[in-house]
Amino acid sequence: MIAIITGDIINSQNTDSELWLPKLKNLLGSWSATPENWEVYRGDEFQLKCSVDEVFSKSLMIKSLIKTFENLDVRLAIGIGNEVFLSEKITESNGSAYVNSGRLLNDIKIEGRTLAIKTENDKVNRDLNILFKWTSIDFDSWSVATAEIIHRLLINPELTQEELAKELNITQSSVSQRIKRSHFDLIQETDFFFRKKIAEL
């Protein structure tokens, strides 16, 4: 069983891709090789293959990175399933994980959602998609400042407030306030719940 994230950047036509595209590629490239495990195509769409238990945290890393750019957002469709054909390019590989993810992206575009999941288990789908609808209310409203903090903490949870303050060139008290506003502890709890739920598959 594998996880596939198919995503597309919202409002990409209004922002210079030279600003966000290299950073997205750097993030995806830090996890695995292209084009076998990830690829950016059509200018603002991408696909990533990863392990099932990591797919939610990786989705949030992508989301928080894109939200560090003013007016940008991203739709993320998570497909869980099998892989029946492995190509040298992820966009040519096939299996239920790919089908679930690709079709789901089309569905959430129509529905106006930004995060959803499709597995072979209807109960898991129902439970996690209700969770995602609630969490997306928060995720979609992240400010650039909040997204910067969340992204750094997701990439490196061991970062101290002092180190974050230095990186972002702000005071430690500002870091503390941003972490509180970001509900980062709740994000971690949600990831833990996701991993537990996905283990039911």
Predicted feature residues:
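Short, Lys/Arg-enriched anionic-surface-contact patches
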Residues: 126-145, 197-199
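DNA major-groove recognition helix of helix-turn-helix
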Residues: 179, 186
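Flexible coil/turn residues that form the inter-helical turn or adjacent wing/linker of helix-turn-helix
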Residues: 156-157
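Short alpha-helical "packing" element that flanks the helix-turn-helix/winged-helix DNA-binding module
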Residues: 148-153
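Short alpha-helical "recognition helix" segments of helix-turn-helix
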Residues: 160-168, 175
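Flexible, glycine/charge-rich interdomain/linker segments that couple
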Residues: 85-92, 108-130
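DNA-contacting interfaces and partner/effector-binding or oligomerization modules
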Residues: 1-106
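Short, basic, alpha-helical segments at the C-terminal edge of helix-turn-helix-like DNA-binding modules
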Residues: 191-201
